[in-house]
Amino acid sequence: MGLNISKEQEERIMSNVPYNHKAIEKKWRERWEQNPVNLKADEKGNKREKYYCLDMFPYPSGNGLHVGHWRGYVISDVWSRYKLQQGYYIVHPMGWDAFGLPAENYAIKMGVHPAISTAENVKNIKRQINEIAALYDWDMEVNTTDPEFYKWTQWIFVKMFKEGLAYEKEFPINWCPSCKTGLANEEVVNGKCERCGTEVTKKNLRQWMLRITKYAERLLSDLDKLDWPEKVKKMQADWIGKSYGAEVDFPIEGREEKITVYTTRPDTLYGATFMVLAPEHELSKSLATDETREAVEKYIYDASMKSNVDRMQDKEKTGVFTGSYAINPLNGEKTPIWLSDYVLADYGTGAIMCVPAHDDRDFEFATKFGIPIVQVIAKDGKEIENMTEAYTEAAGNMINSGEWNGMESAVLKKEAPHIIEKRGLGRATVNYKLRDWVFSRQRYWGEPIPIVHCPDCGAVPVPEEELPLRLPEVESYEPTGTGESPLAGIDEWVNCKCPVCGKPAKRETNTMPQWAGSSWYFLRYVDNHNDKELVSREKADEMLPVDMYIGGVEHAVLHLLYSRFYTKFLYDIGAIDFDEPFHKLFNQGMITGKNGIKMSKSKGNVVSPDDLVRDYGCDSLRMYELFVGPPELDAEWDDRGIDGVNRFLKRLWNLVMDSKDADVKATKDMIKERHRLVYDITTRLESFSLNTAISGFMEHNNKLIEIAKKEGAIDKETLSTMAVLLSPFAPHIAEEIWEQLGHEGSVFAAGWPTYDMEAMKDDEIEVPVQINGKTRAVISVAADISKEDAIAEGKEAVADKLTGTIVKEIYVPKKIINIVMK
């Protein structure tokens, strides 16, 4: 990166020429390599308290890093270095989320085996990440494709299997025709594959599932423990989707079976004039009569070809009458049973009771198919004649509801589940929208699922002592599209012996999703060479859990939810002693190209950091990444903006070079500016207002330059304070300034400075003097001047303009003097 010069030449260059980012950054990279600044103990040997700051580790994409990726890494490093200055030992690791669809799709596109392309991509991105000059501890590095890492990913799965949390199920799943694999609900966005954007369809497949629903209540209630953005907590709460209601049993006319529905409004049961089943409901086909069978079977087939999102979209509802009836358990009325694809088999019971008078969707359906509409809630008890839309107001009194007539609906809503349960018609129930996690993928590039299928013993886990079950090397790794993983074609790997009975058996050929390793990787960083346990209790106690997690909000209901689930499970089995992975979360916004368009190679708007580092230096780019806008919001990139930041660093450098040999004592103005500088940068850093921290440096530097013009130079303590404050943002130049000012050792051993509010106060302030609201003069007065003295001095300043009668004299402290005349 730098110049081939001696240390003596280097020192001479630094002291006598303008800001030279190449020489400075080369010098301090080498110095940090020899003398690391992030130490577990202080100079006296006292152990430092840890602070674990974590980035969401990257997919090793073939496109490398662009300036948008840099933003998150710079934010985390600024925070890490700030905590280092506060005296913490910083746990700040980095690794690679290298299994899964992104890596495999890139390998297929390039015609290279994913093991080769992934290794090449890791090497390139690691080089780019090192250009950031972050505090990453590469001794902690992990890679999800390393067998010594995924041994423990498989170990977690085996533990879940033994605890009954991992199970097999055959059912229609989300299927991406392009990626040729199943997808979890969380990986489908607006009906499209989260990775490639292809329309998602349905495919009936045998799948491995994780029973995340067992943790639904804890995942929801424990959100209150977390110092996370409210937006993310709400997204998770909505995804978990807790609701209170009742399961109600509807007997089927002429049959012994009952259809159980889940409803959050059991108070409206008298108004249920029909019911709708999901086409996949286990009774759907058998409910068809001879007259309806052909139409029912066609409808079931058509529904199976649609994604859940397509089925739930707000468009015209479709349906088919089965020909069968249920009996409303409260009033004994016959209730026609319909099928419609807007009801999903995996929510509730896969069947709903429909109250068209009080639900827009049910009203639309009933109107279309000529089904009776019975109003059971009315405002002031008055029934609506000729309803043209559903009455969906929450408040009202019950009508047409037998013994419930006259009751307030809000009261009955709470009581009805218990009334229904007491009468043996159903059960009071809590329900969740959260579904079990579809965990298997029909791809090659993923962790093999450590299960053996035995004809006699069934599904048997690979013994823990035999882990890792290594992914076999293959020539053909492209997805088959048949619902079988490419591993299914490797007979010598598939065929094995049952670990229990020793008879011939077959290995599971599906692999784990890309989320498997990322759900727990943050634990492995701190004990990544331990081959005996996932993480030792000693290391866990010393460095876990994560104090600050920084990454994009796009993972709110994927990685962040899965990580919480994994952490709670590992806590339950005693592997760790905490049940939430990340104390604090910060979501940075995206850096976009022109007109707010997401950066991508296909759009040709990717900005590589490499050239900017070469031309302006790492420090300038780091500061500009923060300066582009509030870190939590998206920001549009403009290369021209880096000039302003670079200009600030040059002006600061020149100020230091002009002052470092001057024998200047701190004036009141210097001391005041020093304390204001500390206050502004500290408060802005603490509030994560990093863009205003950068502008704060510029503002205060300009003020110091003005003071230097008057006093000849700036005192060393003020400039040293500037270096310490700047060190998290621009570490190279901060180190160099610190050394140029005569300090020994690293600036990162200095400790974060404090401020004194008294020292920040002005001795004198300028106050405008107004007559009838118009400014006539500006005077300098003591900051603590009394009202009487301020008005007296103000009147003196405008004495020649006081030509009328004074009716009022106003002094707003430190703001304004106003004399009202007539």
Across the structure, where does each feature detected by a protein language model lie?
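Residue patterns forming the tRNA-binding/recognition surfaces of aminoacyl-tRNA synthetases
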Residues: 2-11, 18, 26-27, 31-39, ...
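Conserved oxyanion/phosphate-binding beta-strand-loop segments in alpha/beta enzyme cores
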Residues: 12-54, 84-93, 117-124, 228, ...
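N-terminal catalytic cores of NTP/NDP-binding nucleotidyl/phosphoryl-transfer enzymes
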Residues: 42-112, 118, 141-156, 179, ...
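Alpha-helical recognition segments enriched in aromatics with Gly/Pro capping
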Residues: 324-330, 334-347, 376, 494-631
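Helix-rich, typically C-terminal accessory recognition domains appended to large enzymatic cores
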Residues: 97, 162-176, 428-459, 514, ...
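Amphipathic alpha-helical
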Residues: 213, 218-242, 278-320, 465-497, ...
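Basic, alpha-helical terminal appendages of large translation-related enzymes
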Residues: 2-48, 278-281, 290-293, 371-381, ...
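Catalytic alpha/beta core of large soluble enzyme barrels
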Residues: 76, 89, 281-380, 385, ...
